[in-house]
Amino acid sequence: MTDTGTLFLNQQDVIDAGAADVDWVGAVLEQVFKLHEEQAFTAPPSSFLKRPECPHVADRIIGLSAHVGAPFDREGMKWIASSHINPEHGLPRANAVIILNDPVHRLPIAIMEGALISAMRTAVVQALAARYLARPDSESVGLVGAGRIGALTLWAISKWFPDIQHYRAFDQNAGRLQAFVEHMGTLDITVEPVPCFQDALSEADMGIVATTESEPYVTASEFKRGALFMNVSLMDPTFELVSAADKIVVDDWHQSVHSDRVLARMHREGLVTRDSIHGEFGAVVSGHIPGREDPDERIFWNPFGLAIEDIAVASAVYDQALSKGLGKTLRLVDQEWDVLF
């Protein structure tokens, strides 16, 4: 292999390559979950940089690396940083960079803006989960957390569930909630702002939490019969809510219980085991276990978020960028350093 350089893709390049297309990203992610079920990937535990003087659960940097098998056959890392105070300063809560390497020579073939890929795969995974786990006749969606992930998630769901009648949202910041409602209106999604999280979730066929809360507060009273509860964020649901579920579905069992999120805490206390959950989502997508079987069952969906999702989407973006002539080629090395000695 000849070193052809490293393709640099900024956010607009990533968008132009297809990463903002819900259907395109969804097709990639469906493949990813089938590969996960086949164990056609390698993904070590995430690396967390967490400083003791910054105790908030959202204040950290995470390195997620993975190799994803064919048809992608690429490896790489997402380096994603987050600060819970950023929105107060007009900055995005999270930012990310993704590096792709070829799987044989390990040369860096691409460096790309990763926040959009990270946000889109997070949102589209929820829409994909809804396809398999929500009632097909769902009419209402409730959201807690009027941020970018929440907006993208509602947008993705609206693409695949056009018959949704009611969207309700709550956020502790009234100004942010109003801005969220106005923004969603520009996307032809009418969102009703509500005064408390209970009003957003208690009657929702799909309940979504996408916040940076560090303590649980959502109870089983906000998890109605027949609902799908999507635990997109960190610590919002109580043990009681999780225990009320008829089925618990995770993206990856090992990752889910080796964290500090609600399911991991329940596992450490012996309240949730591998045998007590319904299974991993890849098994559902592959048809090895059923998704929703009963219109009245309550399903708790716990997506940890997987590096293979990021690397697969980034790999597909890279291929599209090459075919469309997007980005700029960088030369990281003009000559090997050892020629200097």
Question: Model features per residue range: what roles?
Answer:
Residues W160-G185:
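NAD(P)-binding Rossmann-fold cofactor-contacting core
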Residues G150-A151:
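N-terminal Rossmann-fold NAD(P) dinucleotide-binding loop
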Residues L133-S140, D163, K224-R225:
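Short helix-loop-beta connector
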Residues M1-A119, A127, D137, G279, ...:
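N-terminal ligand-binding/catalytic initiation module
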Residues D13-A19, V242-L340:
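Adenosine-phosphate binding glycine-rich loop
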Residues L187-L271:
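Rossmann-like adenosine-cofactor binding region
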Residues A146-G147:
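Glycine-rich Rossmann-fold phosphate-binding loop(s) that bind the pyrophosphate
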Residues I157:
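Aromatic pocket-lining residues of Rossmann-like dinucleotide-binding sites
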